[in-house]
Amino acid sequence: IFYPSVGLSAVISSMADLSKAGISFLKVRGSYAEVGNAPERYITGPNYTLTNGVVSTATIAPAKHLEAERTKSFEAGLDVKFLGNKISATATYYNTNTYNQLFLYDAPPSSGYKQKYINAGKVNNWGIEASAGYKNTWRDFSWATTLNFSMNRNKIKELVPEGTRDPDTGSLVDIKEVNKDYGGYRVKLVEGGSIGDFYVKGLLTDDKGHIYVDPNSNTVLLDPDPEAYIFAGNTEARFRWGWNNQFSYKGVSLGVLIDARIGGRGVSATQALMDRFGVSQDSADARENGGVWISDDQQVPDAKTFYANSGDGMAMLSHYVYSMTNVRLRELTLGYDLPSKWFRNKVNMSVSFVGRNLFMFYNKAPFDPEVTASTSTYYQGVDFFMQPSVRTLGFSVKLQF
């Protein structure tokens, strides 16, 4: 299989004198590449399972007509430095299209299988990565700072092209959407949507959209419609920022890294279950306040029954959708270079303290948005009794001979 790639760059500052504009370095670059991704293992033959001595027949047909997933990408950018390299900036734009992804679809009964594989789909990703930096030295003091920015947008351009036929039977293959359900959480892939779009089950509402309170039990009810999913958002961040600062003065160095994730939404099944069993702060507040406020002017007095319905596992998650925007102190370092004369100029020794993931300046979710149940397409942005995020503290000694 042929996967071509080509790259081209030009250092403009070497071709022309840009010093009058204050530019000490200017480079432009571009590239194009195609890469492949092999299908899953063991799908070209029938798979049988053995359970308690009983062999189960294969339900997914062996994949006979496979093509490798293919990604075509284009990238363009520039690097520039000003004022004798004291100020620097980079910017990159990329655009990728991925084809021939592997889907499972319901097979015709005559095939003897429940599902079959097919190569289809087209997903577009485009984004921008940029950074700006400044560094300078004033006698014994130096400072270097870098601000990073990135964003990515994706769009499902196509699932299965209209008119696609089963390679074995010739019957039409019609896939309008791909759904993956986990209780009241659904990931839906549909043309025009984005990877990361998710939907949740909600409470029963009246004709005006207000939460319905049953007059007999004086509590809320789950929406009985099995397809009554509410669009909750997308798990992907809208933007990401990072700000790194390095200070140095007479052998003492200080490094501070702050980063931010802006946008994206997730759900907390952990919070739902804690409410369900009455061991959360919200359930304690509801008991103390005489019930649960479901709107500005509507209260359900029976907190126990309310949380039994709304927090029953992952059955109803519309009340447990949170913004995953957060800003944190990602890393802090403090070091000291011991004078080399202490070691007769034969050894350079430095000691440093390092702290990572120390605390958050801002986070409204009851979980760490950077910790997720899975990195797969279908289970991101879900908090389900995840391991707590870790704050680490360390100390290092470095010797150079």
Predicted features, each with a name:
Residues N52-V54, F103-D106, S217-D223, D302-G311, ...:
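Active-site-adjacent bridging/hinge elements
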